[in-house]
């Protein structure tokens, strides 16, 4: 069944729209502009990046700095009745070693050829991403898995079952990497994260061009983009092309698992919760949640303690009395159904309010709206975003994971 594109709140009025953005400072070296990075303390992460040697030789050839002229970013609206032009435009740039923003069913991705280390280096530069945080490789068909990964015989049946159940879809598998995949893609790890997207455009581009590395199309640590306009706000002037494929269907980054075989049988190590829930995965094998300890090796994207964060501090309020408003401060409220929750009911003077699932209380709708609502509150000029928790079940586990990491950005 064809992927359904959901309309964005602000569709482009023209098929191609240029955008220019003034770059003020180096985006990967030590000169991190706090206004650009949202005060997420990423400068220290970059200074202490143990895998910087993987990145430096490639960055030196195409430095992105204050001396670099801004790029004319084109916003190309996909024609879902005939998207050959869309695919052709994206593939042509990828073959030139450029990066492009592409829609997926989860969030928009920033794509580059997975086998071209110099092109992959541009992803890290544009996103201001430390090289110890690995990327996800997107393939265009199931059979392409063997081009980027090696499936051990002991888990082949398990992997086949996962692929049959959840590909194309929002499930990423961490497997031993193929020798052709550059170390930069995997942050020097012997494993690679792979998925087959359910979005026609991402999948078709990967079919025509070949496997592509594509993390979320935003600056590192910030809110993931679920619309083309959000990508433009984040990366306009830094990349040549954004494909507008509508709002993302799932709204949260993919679930990441590492299939393994133990003495007691197959186990799915859950590295990042996402749209494919723990309950879904348990139908196939035992699931073990992996919680990264401080200083531990990052095994997959999205494991940093601070991530997915607005520039505005965020606080999750779970009990009455946890939040006491200060006079003269402006507050934004992120509610689940719209009531504000029992602990917040007495505080009604909110500068801005966003509701994840108005009146319905549906976790699936809350997941789709999460990043949009956070962006709206972040732009509202408040001093603090107060977030109400959601049920820690199904996709609610992934929602709470994102909120906790967003809150950790401003301890």
Predicted regions: what they are:
Residues 42-50, 56:
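N-terminal polybasic/positive-inside topogenic patches
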Residues 7, 14, 31-34, 40-41, ...:
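Alpha-helix boundary/capping motif
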Residues 58, 63-411:
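Active-site-adjacent structural elements in enzyme catalytic cores
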Residues 18, 26, 44, 65-68:
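Serine residues within intrinsically disordered or low-complexity segments
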């Amino acid at each position: 069944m064809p992927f359904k594109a959901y309309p964005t709140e602000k569709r482009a009025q023209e098929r191609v729209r240029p955008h220019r953005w003034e770059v003020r400072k180096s985006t990967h070296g030590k000169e991190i502009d706090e206004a650009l990075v949202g005060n997420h303390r990423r400068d220290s992460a970059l200074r202490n990046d143990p895998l910087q040697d993987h990145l430096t030789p490639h960055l030196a050839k195409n430095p992105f700095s204050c001396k670099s002229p801004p790029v004319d970013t084109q916003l190309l609206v996909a024609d879902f009745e005939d998207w050959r032009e869309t695919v052709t435009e994206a593939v042509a740039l990828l073959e030139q070693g450029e990066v492009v923003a592409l829609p997926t069913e989860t969030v928009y991705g920033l794509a580059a050829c997975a086998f071209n280390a110099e092109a992959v280096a541009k992803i890290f530069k544009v996103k201001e991403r430390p090289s110890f945080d690995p990327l996800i490789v997107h393939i265009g068909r199931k059979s392409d898995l063997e081009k980027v990964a090696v499936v051990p015989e002991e888990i082949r049946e398990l992997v086949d079952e996962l692929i049959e159940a959840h590909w194309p879809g929002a499930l990423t598998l961490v497997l031993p990497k193929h020798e052709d995949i550059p170390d930069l893609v995997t942050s020097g790890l012997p494993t690679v994260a792979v998925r087959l997207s359910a979005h026609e455009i991402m999948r078709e581009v990967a079919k025509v061009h070949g496997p592509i590395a594509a993390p979320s199309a935003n600056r590192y640590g910030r809110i993931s983009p679920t619309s083309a306009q959000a990508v433009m706000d984040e990366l306009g002037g830094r990349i040549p092309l954004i494909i507008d494929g509508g709002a993302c269907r799932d709204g949260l980054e993919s679930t990441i698992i590492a299939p393994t075989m133990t003495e007691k049988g197959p186990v799915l190590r859950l590295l990042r919760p996402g749209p494919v829930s723990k309950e879904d995965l348990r139908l196939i094998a035992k699931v073990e949640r992996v919680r990264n300890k401080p200083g531990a090796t990052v095994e997959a994207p999205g494991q940093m303690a601070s991530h997915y964060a607005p520039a505005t501090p965020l606080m999750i309020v779970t009990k009455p009395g946890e939040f006491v408003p200060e006079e003269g401060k402006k507050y934004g409220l992120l509610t689940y159904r719209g009531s504000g929750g029992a602990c917040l009911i007495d505080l009604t003077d909110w500068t801005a309010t966003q509701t994840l699932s108005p009146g319905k209380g549906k976790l699936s709708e809350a997941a789709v709206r999460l990043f949009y609502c956070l962006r709206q509150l972040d732009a509202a000029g408040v001093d603090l975003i107060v977030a109400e928790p959601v049920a820690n079940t199904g996709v609610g586990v992934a929602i709470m994971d994102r909120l906790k990491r967003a809150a950790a950005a401003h301890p």
